[in-house]
Amino acid sequence: MRKSEAEGLISEAYEAWEAEEWLAAAALFERVLARFPDEERSAVWWYDAALAHKFLRNWAKAYALGREAAARAPRGEGDPAFWNLGIAATIQGDWATARAAWAGFGIELPAGEGEIDGRFGAACVRLDTGGEREVVWIDRLCPTRGRVMNVPVTAGRRFGEVVVHDGEPTGRRVVDGREFPVFDELLLLRASELPTLEVTVNAGEVADLDALIALFVEHDFGAEPASSLEMLCSCCSEGTHEQSRKVHAGAQRVSLAAPEEEARLLLERWAGETAIGRSWSGLETVG
């Protein structure tokens, strides 16, 4: 292959890219890179080929091509080649490469080897389940993984599952003046064994409802009052949205994440802590 032919193929690749024909674009980049892996612009082509496979959710290819892109990227300067490799390596379970990628990007990690289990703060993730989208809170374990801390209302999703999310925020949530990024989900990495239950509770005061939530959290379970849910259009969801707590007292449905027998015991304990004002009924498994 001559360089003039390679230039033509690269032009075709970017035409395919503009049309969002990711597979065709990646194939053209790879064809050129097989002959010219280390030209001045090759680092960009490696990156774009890896990115195309990321869009296709072909993580094995995104990982292999991402390694080549990162090998040609400057370390410690926030180069996105390292971020995309960190995502792909995490999904592939290659923790050594993931750690090296985050360090190459310029992120300080907890010391150690193997799976990263750090404290990277709270954020939100927009779950995408068959086109049904729901924003939930996560506890970030690394730059791209988080544990779901809400009880999702989306069928098939669970409290405690670990998801992989993208690196570019697609929205913001503001709570008490503090901004939190909203990331798009890329993959459900680890399912949760905790079933989702629903129960009707009667809480005399908001403090009674808070006590129920705190009791489940204390046992590493989840409790989500229906009154805390908020429906947003996609435009608002992907913008900056100020979020405030809106739970109320009275009879309402509450979603729980816990084994059924343990949920019953905790509900009985909660109801029995006061003489009046707390009751529950209709506990059932929903997911």
Predicted regions and their residues:
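TPR-repeat structural position
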Residues: 22-23, 59, 95
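TPR/TPR-like (Sel1-like) alpha-helical repeat modules
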Residues: 70-71, 87-111
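Start-of-helix register in tetratricopeptide repeats
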Residues: 7, 41-44, 78-80
